[in-house]
Amino acid sequence: MKGLFKSKPRTPADLVRQTRDLLLFSDRSTSLPDLRDSKRDEKMAELSRNIRDMKSILYGNSEAEPVAEACAQLTQEFFKEDTLRLLITCLPKLNLETRKDATQVVANLQRQQVNSRLIASDYLEANIDLMDVLIEGFENTDMALHYGAMFRECIRHQIVAKYVLESDHVKKFFDYIQLPNFDIAADAAATFKELLTRHKSTVAEFLTKNEDWFFADYNSKLLESSNYITRRQAIKLLGDILLDRSNSAVMTKYVSSRDNLRILMNLLRESSKSIQIEAFHVFKLFAANQNKPADIVNILVANRSKLLRLLADLKPDKEDERFEADKSQVLREIAALEPRDLA
């Protein structure tokens, strides 16, 4: 007879619904002063267990791999209503381990397909204001790494990345990258890189429309930063952006600017070899440009002897045939330049 009264096992959808109810409780509990602490603690402990159980379904555990059908059920229920919004809103009220679990759950759900569709993308398109909340999370020291990781997964969706790039939010990253907290600054830098490299056509469109202010800020705030790590990351990312074929029109304009050339020549003279090497990969684009403006040619000619000497001594720590071939080509290009009359 015992078997007749066994409770039915929870389905993934049940788990999400119960979690949603607990998140609603958590959201309201601060406005319920008469609520006993023991009751609140009990509910929060249950919420932590549920989020951990969702993580186990999505990632599997030491005993079992994730089951596709269970993942699909969980994903469908999660995005059916505002569970993601509730989870993001309530995240500061969760303990550290549960925040980590919740961050992993949100990250995984961005990649889950239901009937061959990424329904997270559809949900975020309809609830795009959630990106505003996640971005502002970078300003909260306790929450920045959790919100930052969620944000980075959300911009895997092109529609979300496009929204961020077209908003004023993108300008905030110039400051976030230089926050005094090293971990948060590094996380912001990783997110900025993802934003500017993942979706090629969206990035090319953004840079074409915004190249004047974007590169002015990039130069002054990042490449000329007093922080060595900021400069090193920025020159590496600049190379990744300009060397991408999708950005060829932007690159051509970038290497026609006297101000950009001046900054690159300063970076070539850095004491840090890693910055020098990364700066070379951008500088070679100026040298290779077959339609150099007269003022670019004249700057290169005026600094020719210094540049030839500096580049001759520049060697990566490991032998690199491609680097040496590029360097030889740049040396030839600079040596062959003739001064030009300014129009």
From Swiss-Prot:
Entry's family note: Belongs to the Mo25 family.
One Gene Ontology cellular component term attached to this UniProt record is: plastid
Q: Which residues form a coiled coil?
A: none
This chain belongs to the protein called Putative MO25-like protein At5g47540
InterPro entries listed in its UniProt record? ARM-like, ARM-type_fold, Mo25
